[in-house]
Amino acid sequence: MTKKISPKSPGKQRKRIYKSPIHSHKKMLKCRLDEFLQEEYGLRSLVVKKGDLVRVMRGQFRDTEGKVVRVDYSTIRVYLESATTTKADGKEAQIPVHPSNIMLVKLELDDDRKRIIDNKVVKTAESE
């Protein structure tokens, strides 16, 4: 079976992301871990989850840390407590941030996530 060749043109790359099924967007919601977390867990990246503490690395809210309030799978965006703006009527509105522009600082660990981390570490150890 041959591997599907991805197009080189940026427009076709973006189209492929937008047209992909929503269940495959979870892979696109990965972001890198802080250096201390990388050493602790032996992983470079993990999928962002509600409740995680993240640091914004690029954009308008650069160098701000905040808790993840919501993860939007359809638009591949993350909403943070600290990334807000004031609307014309005075209400606070959250600004969406792309996962490639944030870094995980503290993880929201539950049993399911611990299992995922353990499975990934075992797989990387076996491949080496």
Q: Which residue stretches match the model-derived regions?
A:
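Short, solvent-exposed secondary-structure boundary/capping segments
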Residues: 75-82, 92
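Residue-level "contact hotspot" at macromolecular interaction interfaces
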Residues: 44-47, 59, 96
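Short beta-strand-centered aromatic/proline hotspots
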Residues: 63-71
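Intrinsically disordered, low-complexity, charged/polar segments
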Residues: 1-11, 15, 86-128
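Intrinsically disordered, Lys/Arg-rich N-terminal extensions and targeting peptides
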Residues: 1-49, 122-128
